[in-house]
Every structure is written in C-alpha cells, then in structure tokens.
C-alpha cells in the first residue's frame, strides 16, 4: 500500500522530515488522521512527521501559535522541531507565541536566546487539560502548531488522543 511505500522510501533514503497533508473525512467511520497517516505514525520512529491541514496559503499566516507539552524539552527531537518552527517564522517574518509549562518555557527561552532574531512571546499552559484556553487567543491569520509525542515517550500525554475533537 501507499503508506508502506512511503515508509520504505523514508528509511532507505534516511529522510528525517516527512510532511503529509491531512485527509478530509469521507464518511463517519473515517478516523481524524486517516488510515495512511496512522500507518505512517506507526511505521516511522526517528522521523519528524509534520501533518499539515492547510486552510489558507502559507504566505498569509501572520503569527505562529505553538502548544508544547510538558517535558518536550527532554525529548531527542526538541531541537529539531524548534528549528523547523524557527525557520518557518524567519522565512515568513512573523512572531511566534509558545504555550508551555514553566520548565518547558525555560528550555524554549534558552533556544530563543541562541536565535535572537526571533520575535517570540510565551504564555503559560500549566496543564494539557487547559489546551482549549489557547483557542480564546487565536486570531485571524494565526496558525496553530501542536507539538505532540509518540506513545511511551517522556512528553506523551493521553490527552493527545482528544486533540482531533477540539
């Protein structure tokens, strides 16, 4: 199937970043992510998987709003996804707002000191149960980026499963 072909290509070419579009549910029994993306999540382990659901052209984005789970700074991929967000914000010349708990915010601020050209701000997200609070601060022109983790990793939270329903 298509997912297996993609996984084989990713592994044989040592691809580190994979960007895929999210599908639109065809019927009520479809999952939010769809079978192919679910297979990609299960079939990859060392890749940065970016699932993108464009609602508007990327050049119309005015601000990135990034929700970061607690302990994300302890994950191997922390520097990688931060670098991707930094690159997007730099290329578009837009600000970034990070929502994270106190410890994760400290780590994010250290990363931002290295990249002083970034226009960043921080808001507290004490608990992932407060995820919906972010929606009150989303403005027209914002793009929401949700950092998640794979099951059985330090920053994984069972509440990630509910994100599609928000």
Question: What are the residue ranges of the model-derived segments?
Answer:
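Catalytic cores of nucleotide-enabled group-transfer and carboxylate-activating enzymes in metabolic
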Residues: 1, 13-17
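A short, well-structured beta->alpha microelement
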Residues: 1-9, 118-137
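Solvent-exposed alpha-helical segments within well-ordered globular domains of core cellular machineries
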Residues: 4-11, 38, 83
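Intrinsically disordered or low-complexity boundary/linker segments at protein termini
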Residues: 16-110, 115-128, 139-143, 149-166
